[in-house]
Amino acid sequence: MASAFLNAAAKFIFTRRQTGPEQAPSPTCAPSHQQRSVRFETRAGDPNLMSPSSSLPGAQAQRFDDDDPLSDAFATAAAQESLPEPDPMPVDGGTLSLSTRVEYSALPRGSTQEVFGLVTIQAPMTSCAQERQAMDLICVLDVSGSMRGDKLRQVQDAVRFVIDQALPTDRLGLVTFNSFAKRALRLRRMDTEGRDEAIAETLRLSAGGGTSIASGLETAVQVMEQRRQRNRVSAILLLTDGIDGSARHRLPSLVGRARAAGCALYTFGFGADHDAGLLSEVAEQAETPFTYVEDTEHIREAFAGAVGGLASVVAQRVELTLNGRVALKTVHTAFAVRRVSESSAVVSIPDIFAGERRDVVLELVVPAAEGTAEMTELLEASARYADLTLQRGVGVLVQSSSVLMTAERVAEPQPEAEPDEEVSAQRERVEVTQALQEAAAHSDAGRYEAAQQLLEAADQRLESAGRKEKTRVHNALAQELADARGRMKSRGAWEQGGRAEVRDACQMHKMQRCTNTASSSKGGVQKSAKMMYISAQQDEWVQRSKNC
């Protein structure tokens, strides 16, 4: 496909960015995560070039405020993004649905119980034929010396697919980087003239030089920050096959700036030599997937999965409020959690695609019931978010109806009671993800035997759950553990793609989102987890990328 294009054209817990779970406030425990600042200097001369450096007095910022005007009458000017949101719609509005479940539907009345609960946000399915939101996309492409040959051709082909699928209301920009970064294409509307220019710039790409990932991302962030107008859905797609040893301390602030500019950030690493640790850290901070493309011929599919998801965003800035009627011990989620009190918290989710769900696993401390109470209210959940399905080009602020989590109180325990299947499945997802993260840390340190022991223990816990029937989630997690064991059996297996595949898997399960459906070819196990998280619209885009 690439050559044809060129010829034709000429502890079982995880939490967001922390080493432990989101706990209730404690006077003896403070968050360990700290944002590290990063600064850049631009090169003199070419206004589209930038090089990484420590901050120097008088460094001149580049101007990238030459984006094409939006053609959409409902477009929101960038300056208006900071204005207060309108009052929420009536509580019965909105496209997302909320539900709650508790591990055991009946709890002993006379004693305190610790139980798991589950709050699920579900987005409805939509059709690709429906009118979608316009997008601002910037592809940040590695054109260092290691990209020569087929790698660069595959990247060009992937970008061409994005161009071909774009609507005239979409805008696309290109940033390339090797030793320096360059804005190759300003943010252009994908009408006929814009498409032609985008294709021409894609064909001009050539490989050579070093790898300055941070410079490429800095340039893309500046473009997004300086836009005169913004499409409602915006994203940076960063693709590299290399390592930038100076980037780690620079990237956290860039992720924050991208978020402040209303922009998602997706990272793609391919080949055995890219810095999977760095890219997965960026993805974790950006609250997006890290995508490992094991074989270069799948770059096009990976881009299609990401862009197809972005084309189906139905909600942004989701704030899930959890008001506990009992103590809320722990909130298990990869997303930002703000504790309000011992029994209340707010979970912030950047966006949700059509057909996606987000599951928040909770640990609750339920006190003994007084008197002869038959039911206990455990928690009330509600969501506030920008709904993109109600008015084209505008996020209408919605406040959902509240849903309750309750449990029956009985005189005696029920030893034969089965735990709720869905709560158990999501609890297992959390546990397996934590095991994968811990095993990856062992493998990074060369402790492959310790990693194997940890994965074996996780597999035994999974198999000893005592289920009558294996669920789809259970089977996918079992396959994930089997694949990871193959990738952590030796230094060679770990460094030749193992690290990247496991980091990809960890982020996928944490976020409940996937962009690349291609199964691993070297792990020896056909994994089903990727298809478990891919949405119908993403899959349709992926299939389209294979057929056109």
State what each model feature region is.
Residues A2, A9, R101, P108-Q316, ...:
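Exposed acidic/Ser/Thr-rich ligand/metal-binding surfaces
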Residues A2-T126:
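Acidic/polar low-complexity segments with low predicted structural confidence
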Residues L6, F40, E319-E342:
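A surface/secretory-pathway sequence property marking extracellular, secreted
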Residues K11, Q34, V366-C548:
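Long, acidic serine/threonine- and proline-rich intrinsically disordered regions
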Residues L98, V115-G117, L137, V318-L320, ...:
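Hydrophobic residues positioned within well-ordered beta-strands of beta-sheet architectures
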Residues A184-R186, D359, E374-E380:
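Local beta-strand/beta-hairpin segments that build beta-sheet-rich folds
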Residues T333-R357:
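Extracellular adhesion/glycan-binding regions together with long Ser/Thr-
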Residues F353-T372:
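Low-complexity, intrinsically disordered segments enriched in Ser/Thr together with acidic residues
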